[in-house]
Amino acid sequence: MELVDLSVPVETGMPVYPGDPEVSVGPALTVARDGVNVLALHLGSQSGTHVDAPYHVDDRLPRLDELPLERFAGRATVVDARGLGPRAPIGPAAFAAVEGGIVLVATGWSRHWGSPAYEAHPYLTEEAAALLVERGVRTVGVDALSVDPTPAEDFPAHRVLCGAHAVIAENLANLGRLVEAQAAGLAVEVWLMPLRLTGADGAPVRAVARLG
């Protein structure tokens, strides 16, 4: 059995979606002064590797704590969408073999984490999102800043997926290892467990895959 960390590190100055709160992590208490070390965290609900609840794009849709835990864990299908150029659309053809469950889209864009190029990621088209919903997919993850283009005036892929009460995971990492494992015939299981934030639009996660 192999465990793969699919998360980016949470640290001061890390990349965030344009307009989101900047992240800072620093000491609130120290052993020298207070007898214990405690960190103070300042971050948004969409910081780092995180999940979006449907409420993220529509006030009428379920919030994070209203979703079943099954949305955040289970067997995953990994779609290899690597090799695309900046801001390339990922259409329905990429998901022709997908049937239900959790789908992770490996664009390879996590290699740009921390650089300006990270915002020029490939994205899901509205038609691709609609096909995933039609196929019964209720959790979609990407190794990019968003399932929609960045920046965006609208969020069509978000709206289609969230409208079906699907969960979206963004800023995943190391999906290439999952592509290799799946090609070798190994099962891929993932855990995308968010902080239990009441009434939230989303939350950071420690995303982990188990191969075997």
Task: Give the residues covered by each predicted segment.
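Active-/binding-site microenvironments in catalytic and ligand-binding cores
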Residues: 1-212
